[in-house]
Amino acid sequence: MIGKLKGILEHIFDDHIIVNVQGVGYVVFISNRLRPSLPALGESLSLFIETHVREEAIRLFGFIAKAEQEWFCLLQNVPGVGAKVALAILGTLSPDELAQAIALNDIAMISRAPGVGKKVSERIVSELKSKALPFSEKVIHSAPLPHLEVTNQPTNDALSALIKLGFERDQAARALALAVNALEGETVSSALLIRHSLKLLSPPT
Protein backbone atom coordinates (compact mmCIF):
# COMPACT_ATOMS: atom_id res chain seq x y z
CA MET A 1 0.00 0.00 0.00
CA ILE A 2 1.40 3.40 -0.99
CA GLY A 3 0.92 6.16 1.60
CA LYS A 4 3.08 8.93 0.16
CA LEU A 5 4.96 9.69 -3.04
CA LYS A 6 7.87 12.06 -3.54
CA GLY A 7 9.21 12.48 -7.03
CA ILE A 8 9.39 14.63 -10.14
CA LEU A 9 6.26 15.97 -11.83
CA GLU A 10 6.49 14.74 -15.43
CA HIS A 11 3.04 15.25 -16.99
CA ILE A 12 -0.22 17.03 -16.16
CA PHE A 13 -3.51 15.82 -17.64
CA ASP A 14 -7.16 16.80 -17.07
CA ASP A 15 -7.78 14.60 -14.04
CA HIS A 16 -4.40 13.09 -13.23
CA ILE A 17 -0.67 13.63 -13.22
CA ILE A 18 2.38 11.41 -13.67
CA VAL A 19 5.00 11.49 -10.93
CA ASN A 20 8.42 9.99 -11.66
CA VAL A 21 9.83 8.22 -8.61
CA GLN A 22 13.29 6.82 -9.32
CA GLY A 23 12.44 6.05 -12.92
CA VAL A 24 8.94 4.70 -12.31
CA GLY A 25 6.03 6.85 -13.50
CA TYR A 26 3.01 6.77 -11.18
CA VAL A 27 -0.42 7.87 -12.43
CA VAL A 28 -2.01 9.91 -9.63
CA PHE A 29 -5.57 11.25 -9.80
CA ILE A 30 -6.03 14.72 -8.33
CA SER A 31 -8.78 17.25 -7.59
CA ASN A 32 -9.27 20.55 -9.41
CA ARG A 33 -8.22 22.45 -6.29
CA LEU A 34 -4.81 20.79 -6.32
CA ARG A 35 -3.93 21.80 -9.87
CA PRO A 36 -3.01 25.45 -9.10
CA SER A 37 -0.69 24.20 -6.33
CA LEU A 38 1.31 21.93 -8.62
CA PRO A 39 4.94 22.86 -9.25
CA ALA A 40 6.34 23.33 -12.74
CA LEU A 41 7.07 20.26 -14.83
CA GLY A 42 10.42 18.78 -13.88
CA GLU A 43 10.24 19.98 -10.29
CA SER A 44 9.92 17.93 -7.11
CA LEU A 45 6.49 17.05 -5.71
CA SER A 46 5.32 15.31 -2.54
CA LEU A 47 1.78 13.93 -2.16
CA PHE A 48 -0.20 11.97 0.39
CA ILE A 49 -1.60 8.94 -1.42
CA GLU A 50 -4.83 7.01 -1.01
CA THR A 51 -4.62 3.67 -2.82
CA HIS A 52 -7.70 2.00 -4.27
CA VAL A 53 -7.25 -1.64 -5.23
CA ARG A 54 -9.87 -3.03 -7.58
CA GLU A 55 -10.01 -6.20 -9.67
CA GLU A 56 -9.51 -4.25 -12.88
CA ALA A 57 -6.99 -1.67 -11.68
CA ILE A 58 -5.02 -0.03 -8.88
CA ARG A 59 -5.67 3.71 -8.63
CA LEU A 60 -3.71 6.30 -6.70
CA PHE A 61 -5.32 9.53 -5.47
CA GLY A 62 -3.01 12.35 -4.42
CA PHE A 63 -3.42 15.17 -1.90
CA ILE A 64 -1.21 18.02 -0.74
CA ALA A 65 -2.77 18.14 2.74
CA LYS A 66 -3.44 15.21 5.06
CA ALA A 67 -6.88 16.65 5.93
CA GLU A 68 -7.94 16.37 2.28
CA GLN A 69 -6.97 12.71 2.22
CA GLU A 70 -8.91 12.07 5.45
CA TRP A 71 -12.03 13.76 4.09
CA PHE A 72 -11.66 11.78 0.86
CA CYS A 73 -11.91 8.57 2.90
CA LEU A 74 -14.71 9.85 5.14
CA LEU A 75 -16.86 10.93 2.21
CA GLN A 76 -16.72 7.46 0.71
CA ASN A 77 -18.30 6.03 3.85
CA VAL A 78 -21.51 7.78 2.78
CA PRO A 79 -23.81 5.61 0.62
CA GLY A 80 -23.75 6.79 -2.97
CA VAL A 81 -20.41 8.59 -2.66
CA GLY A 82 -17.52 6.98 -4.51
CA ALA A 83 -14.02 8.17 -5.30
CA LYS A 84 -15.17 10.30 -8.25
CA VAL A 85 -17.81 12.17 -6.24
CA ALA A 86 -15.51 12.57 -3.22
CA LEU A 87 -12.80 14.05 -5.44
CA ALA A 88 -15.34 16.39 -7.07
CA ILE A 89 -16.41 17.66 -3.64
CA LEU A 90 -12.81 18.25 -2.56
CA GLY A 91 -12.19 19.93 -5.88
CA THR A 92 -14.91 22.44 -5.01
CA LEU A 93 -14.58 22.86 -1.23
CA SER A 94 -11.55 22.94 1.04
CA PRO A 95 -11.61 20.69 4.14
CA ASP A 96 -12.56 23.70 6.30
CA GLU A 97 -15.32 24.75 3.91
CA LEU A 98 -16.69 21.21 3.81
CA ALA A 99 -16.65 20.93 7.61
CA GLN A 100 -18.41 24.29 7.85
CA ALA A 101 -21.06 23.29 5.30
CA ILE A 102 -21.80 20.08 7.19
CA ALA A 103 -21.89 21.89 10.55
CA LEU A 104 -24.40 24.42 9.24
CA ASN A 105 -26.40 21.89 7.23
CA ASP A 106 -25.59 23.96 4.15
CA ILE A 107 -26.91 21.58 1.50
CA ALA A 108 -26.56 24.17 -1.27
CA MET A 109 -22.86 24.65 -0.59
CA ILE A 110 -22.10 20.93 -0.89
CA SER A 111 -24.30 20.67 -3.99
CA ARG A 112 -21.99 23.12 -5.78
CA ALA A 113 -19.71 20.18 -6.53
CA PRO A 114 -20.20 18.69 -10.02
CA GLY A 115 -22.42 15.60 -9.97
CA VAL A 116 -23.55 16.12 -6.38
CA GLY A 117 -27.30 16.56 -5.99
CA LYS A 118 -29.46 17.55 -3.06
CA LYS A 119 -30.12 13.99 -1.86
CA VAL A 120 -26.43 13.09 -1.78
CA SER A 121 -25.61 16.37 -0.02
CA GLU A 122 -28.28 15.70 2.61
CA ARG A 123 -26.88 12.21 3.12
CA ILE A 124 -23.37 13.62 3.58
CA VAL A 125 -24.59 16.04 6.26
CA SER A 126 -26.53 13.32 8.04
CA GLU A 127 -23.73 10.75 7.98
CA LEU A 128 -20.76 13.02 8.69
CA LYS A 129 -22.09 15.72 11.03
CA SER A 130 -20.23 14.16 13.97
CA LYS A 131 -16.97 14.31 11.98
CA ALA A 132 -17.08 17.96 10.91
CA LEU A 133 -15.99 19.93 13.97
CA PRO A 134 -12.80 17.98 14.75
CA PHE A 135 -11.46 19.09 11.35
CA SER A 136 -11.98 22.78 12.17
CA GLU A 137 -9.78 25.08 14.21
CA LYS A 138 -10.55 26.05 17.84
CA VAL A 139 -12.95 23.15 18.36
CA ILE A 140 -14.19 21.48 21.51
CA HIS A 141 -13.56 17.93 20.36
CA SER A 142 -15.88 16.33 22.89
CA ALA A 143 -18.88 18.44 21.89
CA PRO A 144 -21.49 16.73 19.69
CA LEU A 145 -22.09 18.49 16.41
CA PRO A 146 -25.33 20.46 16.27
CA HIS A 147 -27.65 20.08 13.33
CA LEU A 148 -28.38 23.59 12.06
CA GLU A 149 -30.83 24.64 9.39
CA VAL A 150 -29.50 27.39 7.14
CA THR A 151 -33.11 28.50 6.71
CA ASN A 152 -33.36 29.18 10.45
CA GLN A 153 -33.70 32.96 10.72
CA PRO A 154 -31.98 33.47 14.12
CA THR A 155 -29.04 31.40 12.89
CA ASN A 156 -28.76 33.36 9.65
CA ASP A 157 -29.11 36.69 11.45
CA ALA A 158 -26.45 35.72 13.99
CA LEU A 159 -24.05 34.57 11.27
CA SER A 160 -24.52 37.82 9.33
CA ALA A 161 -23.97 39.88 12.48
CA LEU A 162 -20.75 38.07 13.37
CA ILE A 163 -19.41 38.58 9.85
CA LYS A 164 -20.26 42.29 10.05
CA LEU A 165 -18.32 42.45 13.32
CA GLY A 166 -15.23 41.44 11.37
CA PHE A 167 -15.00 37.69 11.90
CA GLU A 168 -14.23 35.40 9.00
CA ARG A 169 -17.23 33.35 7.85
CA ASP A 170 -15.65 30.03 8.77
CA GLN A 171 -14.71 31.26 12.27
CA ALA A 172 -18.19 32.64 12.84
CA ALA A 173 -19.86 29.46 11.57
CA ARG A 174 -17.85 27.20 13.86
CA ALA A 175 -18.55 29.32 16.91
CA LEU A 176 -22.22 29.50 15.97
CA ALA A 177 -22.43 25.72 15.62
CA LEU A 178 -21.01 25.27 19.12
CA ALA A 179 -23.31 27.96 20.51
CA VAL A 180 -26.41 26.22 19.19
CA ASN A 181 -25.22 22.96 20.70
CA ALA A 182 -24.71 24.64 24.09
CA LEU A 183 -28.18 26.22 23.95
CA GLU A 184 -29.98 23.04 22.95
CA GLY A 185 -33.46 22.91 24.44
CA GLU A 186 -33.68 26.67 25.00
CA THR A 187 -35.64 29.25 23.05
CA VAL A 188 -32.90 30.63 20.85
CA SER A 189 -32.79 34.18 19.54
CA SER A 190 -30.17 35.73 17.29
CA ALA A 191 -29.00 37.95 20.17
CA LEU A 192 -28.46 34.93 22.43
CA LEU A 193 -26.58 33.10 19.69
CA ILE A 194 -24.36 36.13 19.09
CA ARG A 195 -23.50 36.48 22.79
CA HIS A 196 -22.52 32.82 23.12
CA SER A 197 -20.58 32.89 19.85
CA LEU A 198 -18.64 35.98 20.92
CA LYS A 199 -17.57 34.20 24.11
CA LEU A 200 -16.14 31.40 21.99
CA LEU A 201 -14.48 33.80 19.57
CA SER A 202 -12.95 36.02 22.25
CA PRO A 203 -9.25 35.32 22.87
CA PRO A 204 -8.45 33.81 26.28
CA THR A 205 -7.37 36.29 28.94
From Swiss-Prot:
Homotetramer. Forms an RuvA(8)-RuvB(12)-Holliday junction (HJ) complex. HJ DNA is sandwiched between 2 RuvA tetramers; dsDNA enters through RuvA and exits via RuvB. An RuvB hexamer assembles on each DNA strand where it exits the tetramer. Each RuvB hexamer is contacted by two RuvA subunits (via domain III) on 2 adjacent RuvB subunits; this complex drives branch migration. In the full resolvosome a probable DNA-RuvA(4)-RuvB(12)-RuvC(2) complex forms which resolves the HJ. Belongs to the RuvA family. The RuvA-RuvB-RuvC complex processes Holliday junction (HJ) DNA during genetic recombination and DNA repair, while the RuvA-RuvB complex plays an important role in the rescue of blocked DNA replication forks via replication fork reversal (RFR). RuvA specifically binds to HJ cruciform DNA, conferring on it an open structure. The RuvB hexamer acts as an ATP-dependent pump, pulling dsDNA into and through the RuvAB complex. HJ branch migration allows RuvC to scan DNA until it finds its consensus sequence, where it cleaves and resolves the cruciform DNA. This is Holliday junction branch migration complex subunit RuvA. The gene is ruvA. One of its GO terms (cellular component) is cytoplasm. Residues 144-149 are annotated as: Flexible linker. It comes from Bartonella henselae (strain ATCC 49882 / DSM 28221 / CCUG 30454 / Houston 1) (Rochalimaea henselae). The lineage of its organism: Bacteria, Pseudomonadati, Pseudomonadota, Alphaproteobacteria, Hyphomicrobiales. Residues 150-205 are annotated as: Domain III. It is found in: Cytoplasm. Keywords: Cytoplasm, DNA damage, DNA recombination, DNA repair, DNA-binding. Its main location: cytoplasm. Has three domains with a flexible linker between the domains II and III and assumes an 'L' shape. Domain III is highly mobile and contacts RuvB.
